[in-house]
Amino acid sequence: MATNGLMASSSVFLHRPRIAFASRTNQTVGKYGKGRVSFMGIGTRRLPVVLSMTAMADSGEEAVKSVLPGNGISIMVNGCSGKMGKAVIKAADSAGVNIVPISFGSAGEDGQRVEVCGKEITVHGPTEREKVLSSVFEKHPELIVVDYTIPSAVNDNAELYSKVGVPFVMGTTGGDRNKLYETVEEAKIYAVISPQMGKQVVAFLAAMEIMAEQFPGAFSGYSLDVMESHQASKLDASGTAKAVISCFQELGVSYDMDQIQLIRDPKQQVEMVGVPEEHISGHAFHLYHLTSPDETVSFEFQHNVCGRSIYAEGTVDAVLFLAKKIRLKADQRIYNMIDVLREGNMR
């Protein structure tokens, strides 16, 4: 089987256009592990394996309404002008969480007002952020900050939250992750840190890490093809895909990360991948295809997400989880989405 990409002429996927991504069935807290891309630093606790998963944005609308009331929790969503920030505000509002009408953004956004769910939120630029955050925290001592900003701001933002002492949920990817954990650990504040807030996707990733640890070398000699499709604005390869590939590498598969086939062209996304046109601007489709050396055995793993509600709902659950830990004065201070799942907060 050809291994130079899923769109190669000899690839089996060309015999199945439009369904390449279609579902066939319609802690270590702290530094990341070394040697491979460990998505969550999950540790050694293991769960059953999940093979395929598809989520649609609108399907979670009713689920988000089932969240327990906010119980006095207030959140400040930094990056509120972005699509994820707005999605989190909508999910939090449905959950009964109080939305503080203040947010941090870029210098160009300073002074802007963003309206979401009938709430007008004032955006503050980089200047006087510490003064503003301290004032908000004093007024709302139950405050939890949610960060959906940009990768280059991750470490500066974490340092700010740590200096003020406000707990936070970090949904922004990138930055120096080791430094991020060190900053929070030194400040001894409460935080949920995760580059992937979709709980079901996190469960799939956990299952992959379980399989990799329990059955190293199980797929030795197999070839791997990986295709991922995201909105055109995402220029880099999926971190989720890299984490799954790392698991396959431990399972004995030889594969370089630069072999990942990135689909960013809207026409290909609709015609070949099968992304609904209404979700071209916001989706995350992943497909992993394994083939035995003699091409008599093949395995497929996939997870497809349309929209952002799966991430927004997971973020709200992380907020509720963290608020509970703060009230209980838990000894552990830094958590990830695996901890949220283990708490039984699946909606």
UniProtKB/Swiss-Prot annotation:
Pathway: Amino-acid biosynthesis; L-lysine biosynthesis via DAP pathway; (S)-tetrahydrodipicolinate from L-aspartate: step 4/4. Transmembrane segments: none annotated. The active site is at H230, K234. One of its GO terms (biological process) is diaminopimelate biosynthetic process. (S)-2,3,4,5-tetrahydrodipicolinate binds at G239, T240. InterPro entries: DapB_C, DapB_N, DHDPR_bac, Dihydrodipicolinate_Rdtase_pln, NAD(P)-bd_dom_sf. It catalyses: (S)-2,3,4,5-tetrahydrodipicolinate + NAD(+) + H2O = (2S,4S)-4-hydroxy-2,3,4,5-tetrahydrodipicolinate + NADH + H(+); (S)-2,3,4,5-tetrahydrodipicolinate + NADP(+) + H2O = (2S,4S)-4-hydroxy-2,3,4,5-tetrahydrodipicolinate + NADPH + H(+). Its EC number is 1.17.1.8. Its main location: plastid. Keywords: Acetylation, Amino-acid biosynthesis, Chloroplast, Diaminopimelate biosynthesis, Lysine biosynthesis, NAD, NADP, Oxidoreductase, Plastid, Transit peptide. The keyword Cytoplasm does not apply. Residues 1-51 form a transit peptide. It is found in: Plastid, Chloroplast. The modification N-acetylserine is found at S52. GO terms for molecular function: 4-hydroxy-tetrahydrodipicolinate reductase; NADPH binding. NAD(+) binds at G79, C80, S81, G82, K83, M84, G171, T172, T173, S194, P195, Q196, M197. Pfam families: DapB_C (PF05173), DapB_N (PF01113). Catalyzes the conversion of 4-hydroxy-tetrahydrodipicolinate (HTPA) to tetrahydrodipicolinate. This is 4-hydroxy-tetrahydrodipicolinate reductase 1, chloroplastic. It comes from Arabidopsis thaliana.
